[in-house]
Amino acid sequence: MREPLSPHSIVEAAGLLLVTYDDNDKSRPDQFLLMRHRDRWDLPKGHCEAGESLVETALRETHEETGISADDISLIAGFSFSLQYPVTYASPQVVSFTKKVTYFLGWITTARPVRCTEHEGYEWFKWSPPHSIQVETIDPLLTAAAAFFERESRSS
């Protein structure tokens, strides 16, 4: 059972930025997946379960929210990106806490249909940084991922 949340609570979560590679250049992404909530875009992510690592959480949540199996995803070594932000839920009572989300990079060979279980839809976006999607969460992640891919392409 989870402890009651307070404004000082930090809730750990993990997610995955899922990309496909450009057929002509395997060092650069071609597309990336975002999930559609009613009023915003998001990535597959969720809270860590007891005894679960952040990577295990990211892979489990991606499978639960997209239907894409961990067996179909290759994690990209050397990248993680964390951010913290305040969250307030007003139902049934007001609860505030800090969410800390750690994102990892994973690739699959081709963009594919996604089974939406917790979202209204999805889209495979063209990788064309800089991106301007959601300034507080998604844009910083995509900026960090773009810098990572650039460093990796220079070192290969």
Where are the language model's segments positioned?
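Short, acidic/hydrophobic/Gly-rich beta-strand patch recurrent on exposed beta strands
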Residues: 33-36
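Short connector loops at helix/strand junctions that flank enzyme active sites
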Residues: 11-13, 38, 96-101
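Unchanged
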Residues: 48-140
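Charged phosphate-binding loop/patch that engages nucleotide di/tri-phosphates or the phosphate backbone
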Residues: 132-156
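Short, surface-exposed loop/turn motifs that are enriched in glycine and acidic residues
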Residues: 6, 47-48
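A short gly/proline-enriched turn/hairpin at secondary-structure junctions
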Residues: 42-46
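Acidic, metal-coordinating catalytic segment for phosphate/diphosphate chemistry
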Residues: 1-24, 93-94
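Conserved beta-strand and immediately adjacent loop positions that scaffold enzyme active sites
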Residues: 15, 31, 121
